[in-house]
Amino acid sequence: LSDMSCRVKYKEEYTSVPILPELRHLVGLPQNPKFHCYDVLEHTLFAIDNGPRDLAIRWALVLHDLGKGLENVRIMKNGQPSDPGHEAVSAAMAEKILTRLQYPPKFVKLVVWLVAQHMRFAPMLLTGEKTLLRWIRSEATSGQFSKQQEMAEAYAKLVEVFLADMGATHA
């Protein structure tokens, strides 16, 4: 994925254009072995394989860890790599990529939300129902979704992203 390109014809001349060069830094990028037995790209590919064949979910899984390993994100914690806040950086990168690839704004908004939220879901499951309900109410009033049905579909997709992501770890 990271080294794939397509040919584009411009003024009667063909040129090679990289499709997703933003993935390049994920190749061989180590993760904390307490949670991951794969490098970031391998984890991403396993997560995609775990997910359903839904375009928004697949894109969210391709892009969910893009922020990992970047200079302003990667830290060493107790001698192990950690990427606090990578989901926000990944979401910003996802928005740029999907916009560049000319996906519709509504689709971009959904995938960006899935990427941005993929780390929030797990801790809330552990802290209890009240915390989860408070978060859902907060998201419902954020203006992110114009209809209740959109919100319900987004949450269902987020569950799928979470399950696919967790299935690609050994946490």
PLM features: residue spans?
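Acidic/His-rich, divalent-metal-binding segments that scaffold phosphate/diphosphate chemistry
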Residues: 1-84
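Divalent metal-dependent catalytic cores for phosphoryl transfer on phosphate-bearing substrates
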Residues: 49-170
